[in-house]
A protein has these predicted regions:
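Blade-loop segments of beta-propeller domains
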Residues: 360-401, 408-416
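Beta-strand-rich domains and repeat architectures in extracellular enzymes and scaffolds
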Residues: 315-320, 327-359
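Beta-rich, blade/repeat-based domains predominating
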Residues: 336-350, 376-394, 415-438, 451-469, ...
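Non-catalytic cap/lid and distal C-terminal segments of serine-dependent acyl enzymes
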Residues: 24-312
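Short loop/turn segments immediately following beta-strands, especially the blade-tip
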Residues: 483-490, 577-584
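Blade/loop signatures of beta-propeller domains
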Residues: 310-329, 491, 584-585
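Short loop/turn segments immediately following the C-termini of beta-strands
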Residues: 356, 395, 435-436, 475, ...
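A short beta-strand motif characteristic of beta-propeller blades
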Residues: 330-335, 368-374, 407-414, 447-453, ...
């Protein structure tokens, strides 16, 4: 037995000794980078100043959140001495509570009239106790702060701020907070910094001024996508101050990314996109020393010119410049539309949608909704043809084609097909996707040809303006499909060609309607608003909808087909663009030259 043990141990040691060992990485030395220094003395405005009245601070616990269930956290509220309680004050939200000597800085700057009277609210991240406290609690900080979603914004707006207003100061002053986004700022350090940016990014209708120190714009929970999203998205009315140091790296997770490089990349993206952004870089590591030293100047800059509103700037993205008209924004075209999933325009550019609960398709016009056709069309998909007829999907299957005045005979095509979306070509052929996730060609003579099956939530279909390619949207996927259109109308060469951006809280794009412009770009209504694709299947621009709502239907319309209509949340929005739409029923034409790049 001893011999066996001796042999086995010896063999094991021999084998272990023969295993490869990791080479030691030489230290990364860049002689152009100054040595690390975290010595940043506080300026006078970050220290108490004689004769300046100090504000009051109180705290309370929050343990009853519905958005972050079972969490416990501390809320800290600073109320300046100048606040009288007779009218709403401006708001600053500090994430990870009130850092950077915020109360003292605000005392001094408010006294100097360098910033408005502002109530500051420090919000710590939540913890969830285990079933056997204090053992192994769940720390929600990364989930709440690093996530690229609107959860934290909703938590602040729906739960924290209302709870703060239910309190009073020790001397009985009521807490009244302004609801004007121009009166609200938010800031934080590290994970609190990306959280502050995310809140303002998701809800620019609630926060417009952002302070970001040593921001965690890395691969924690999707933050590394911000550099690209900022470049591609229609600029929002935000002002951002950024701080970081050349030696910034969080020692607890360097595998997540490079803090210093990510902050520079984020700053460059914001500058490219057209934001009002300022930065100060230093020589520090991952701490708040430099941020605390410059916090007074950052607040002065963020609040400069107040109460003049923070406005969205001209985009730097060349695609956004090409398609957007300066000064044109989303306008409500129709309200009270219930759940609209189909929008379509006729040859005059008049835009119609299915009237919920009524047997007609209705036009979007000011002061009325005239009946378009008397066929059963309540909430049914429909499209217009080059022949002037409207093609409406029937609940019993197939498509009814009738003239818009409903005087001519109705033809039934594609009987037996449970159609979810359709488009009518110039030659009268119909491409349709069914609720069974199949793609069909319905020829003008009534012949049906199944082209594909096993789609993922097929939700839209569009033909390129030259008639050579077919785009099929899949609402339950992260990709859209491209097909080559053959001379007989059938298709081949299927590829998952279109890559959508998907919110971190969703599993799919929710793509639900496609329009094409005369340059060959595709516009798709999605969970993230309208995503604009170039001809190589890449998202080149994103147009968020009001309230960051999802789009559920889309088309070009207007007299010159230069207005984009998008259905969303019971409303239909319109936005006049600098490009012209290419209706599916139009005569195909040759597109401008394009390359493989």
């Amino acid at each position: 037995m001893k011999a066996w043990c001796s042999y086995t141990l010896g063999t094991a040691l021999f084998l272990l000794g023969s295993l490869p060992t990791f080479a030691q990485r030489p230290p990364l030395i860049d002689e152009t980078v100054p040595p690390a220094s975290d010595h940043y003395p506080l300026p006078a405005d970050a220290k108490p100043i004689a004769g300046v009245a100090a504000g009051t601070t109180f705290k309370f616990e929050m343990t009853d959140s519905k958005i972050f269930p079972a969490t416990a956290r501390t809320i800290t509220v600073y109320v300046p001495a100048e606040y009288k309680g007779d009218k709403p004050a401006c708001v600053y939200v500090g994430l990870d509570s009130l850092g950077f000597n915020a109360a003292t800085v605000f005392d001094n700057l408010i006294a100097q009239h360098a910033m408005p009277i502002t109530i500051a609210i420090g919000v710590s991240s939540g913890d969830v106790a285990s079933a056997t406290p204090p053992d192994n609690p769940r720390f929600d900080r990364s989930f709440e702060f690093d996530s690229r979603s609107d959860r934290l914004a909703r938590f602040l707006l729906e739960e924290v701020l209302p709870e703060v207003e239910r309190h009073t100061t020790a001397d009985g002053r009521a807490i009244k907070l302004s609801t004007d986004p121009n009166d609200r700022a938010i800031g934080g350090g590290s994970t609190g910094a990306i959280a502050a940016f995310t809140v303002a990014w998701e809800r620019p209708d609630a926060f417009r001024r952002v302070f970001s120190a040593i921001g965690t714009y890395v691969g924690m929970r999707g933050g590394e996508q911000y550099y690209v999203l900022v470049r591609k998205t229609d600029p929002k009315p935000l002002r951002i101050f950024m701080q970081d140091g050349v030696h910034d790296e969080w020692p607890g997770g360097p595998e997540m990314g490079d803090w210093w490089m990510s902050n520079q990349t984020m700053n460059r993206a914001l500058g490219f996109a057209g934001y009002d952004v300022r930065h100060t870089w230093g020589t520090g590591t991952h701490n708040g020393n430099q941020a605390a030293s410059l916090f007074p100047d950052a607040m002065r800059w963020l609040w400069k010119d107040w109460p003049a509103p923070v406005r969205a700037m001209e985009p730097g993205n060349p695609v956004l410049k090409a398609i957007l008209r300066p000064g044109e924004d989303w306008q409500v075209a129709a309200d009270g539309c219930a759940s609209v999933t189909t929008l379509a325009a006729n040859q005059k550019g008049q835009v119609f949608y299915p009237a919920q609960g009524a047997p007609e398709v209705s036009e979007i016009v000011a002061g009325g909704k005239p009946v378009l056709c008397s066929q059963p069309a309540a909430a049914a998909p429909f499209a217009f043809g080059a022949d002037g007829r409207v093609y409406v999907a029937r609940t019993e299957g197939g498509v009814t084609a009738t003239d818009q005045a409903a005087h001519g005979p109705a033809n039934v095509l594609g009987q037996g097909l449970n159609i979810g979306s359709l488009t009518v070509c110039n030659n009268g052929d119909i491409y349709a996707v069914t609720r069974e996730n199949e793609l069909w060609l319905i020829r003008a003579n009534g012949e049906k040809v199944r082209l594909d099956k096993d789609l993922k939530g097929a939700s839209g279909v569009a033909l390129s303006p030259d008639g050579l390619w077919l785009f099929v949207a899949q609402g339950l996927s992260r990709t859209g499909l491209s097909y080559r259109v053959r001379s007989d109308g059938t298709v081949d060469a299927r590829e998952a060609y279109y890559d959508f951006y998907v919110p971190t809280w969703a599993d799919d794009s929710g793509a639900a309607g496609i329009g094409m412009d005369r340059d060959g770009r595709a516009y798709v209504a999605t969970r993230m608003g309208v995503q604009v694709f170039d001809r190589n299947g890449r998202v080149a621009a994103i147009l968020p909808l009001p309230g960051n709502a999802a789009g559920t239907g889309l088309c070009f319309g207007g007299h010159d087909f230069d207005t984009l209509y998008v259905a969303s949340g019971g409303k239909v929005y319109r936005r006049k663009l600098h490009v012209t739409g290419a209706p599916p029923w139009a005569v195909p034409f040759k597109l401008p030259p394009w390359g493989a790049g």
